[in-house]
Amino acid sequence: MIRKAFVMQVNPDAHEEYQRRHNHIWPELEAVLKAHGAHHYAIYLDKERHLLFATVEIESEARWEAVASTEVCQRWWKYMREVMPSNPDNSPLSAELKEVFYLA
C-alpha cells in the first residue's frame, strides 16, 4: 500500500456543513473510492486554521488519480465547492504532504 497525506481548506463559516456532507457521503462515491483501491481514508479538521488534513492508503497512483475523472467524483467536487476553496475544475485546492516519519 502507498500512504498519502494532503491538506485542504474549508471555508470558515462551513465547518459544520462540511462535516454534515461527509456524514452522509454518497454510497456511489464510497464505492468508486473502494473500487479504485482507496483504503483507510480519513479527514481531520483544524477548526482554528480552517485546515483539513487527510490520509489515505492506495493500491496504485494511477488508480487513485483515475478517481478524479469519474462522474460521481466530478459531481461531488461541484457539490463541495461552496464549502471549500476549489480549483477552476471544481477539485479542492490541496497540497500533498511528504512523509517524514512512519512507525509501523
From Swiss-Prot:
**Cited SUPFAM superfamilies:** Dimeric alpha+beta barrel (SSF54909)
Pathway given for this chain reads: Carbohydrate metabolism; L-rhamnose metabolism
Its main subcellular localisation, reduced to a broad class, is cytoplasm
Q: Which InterPro entries match?
A: Dimeric_a/b-barrel (IPR011008), L-rhamnose_mutarotase (IPR013448), Rham/fucose_mutarotase (IPR008000)
Q: How does it assemble?
A: Homodimer.
What PANTHER family does this protein map onto? L-RHAMNOSE MUTAROTASE
Give the function comment from the record: Involved in the anomeric conversion of L-rhamnose.
Name recorded for this polypeptide: L-rhamnose mutarotase
Q: Which organism is it from?
A: Klebsiella pneumoniae subsp. pneumoniae (strain ATCC 700721 / MGH 78578)
